[in-house]
């Protein structure tokens, strides 16, 4: 199977998000890469489901709360930008202050 670099990046994000989901389900607090991966994967999946950029920008702020992540992580993540594939093409989604 031949994958483009973009496809490889998407699979890496998805794999990291699965790991983050499992750790969160076990009650562990997520670190920086796990938090970014989980939010990014949710945005990518929402885009595939047909949600709008505005919906995803809002939903991106509701995926994780301070109680879900290690101390200091919310301050480290000011913005998350992810290129997501929508039914009408690829668009950049920016989530400001994703962990409140």
UniProtKB/Swiss-Prot annotation:
Belongs to the urease gamma subunit family. InterPro entries: Urease_gamma (IPR012010), Urease_gamma/gamma-beta_su (IPR002026), Urease_gamma_sf (IPR036463), Urease_subunit (IPR050069). Keywords: Cytoplasm, Hydrolase. Pathway: Nitrogen metabolism; urea degradation; CO(2) and NH(3) from urea (urease route): step 1/1. Its EC number is 3.5.1.5. This is Urease subunit gamma. It comes from the Bacteria. Its main location: cytoplasm. The keyword Magnesium does not apply. It is found in: Cytoplasm. One of its GO terms (cellular component) is cytoplasm. HAMAP family: Urease_gamma. It catalyses: urea + 2 H2O + H(+) = hydrogencarbonate + 2 NH4(+). GO terms for molecular function: nickel cation binding; urease activity. One of its GO terms (biological process) is urea catabolic process. Heterotrimer of UreA (gamma), UreB (beta) and UreC (alpha) subunits. Three heterotrimers associate to form the active enzyme. NCBIfam families: PRK13241.1 (NF009712), urease_gam (TIGR00193).
């Amino acid at each position: 199977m031949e994958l483009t670099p973009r496809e490889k990046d998407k699979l890496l994000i998805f794999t990291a998000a699965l790991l983050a989901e499992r750790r969160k389900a076990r009650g562990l607090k997520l670190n920086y890469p796990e938090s970014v991966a989980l939010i990014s994967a949710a945005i990518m999946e929402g885009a595939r489901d047909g949600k709008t950029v505005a919906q995803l920008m809002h939903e991106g702020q509701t995926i994780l709360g301070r109680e879900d992540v290690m101390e200091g992580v919310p301050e480290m993540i000011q913005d998350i930008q992810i290129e997501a594939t929508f039914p009408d093409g690829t668009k950049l989604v920016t989530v400001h202050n994703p962990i409140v």
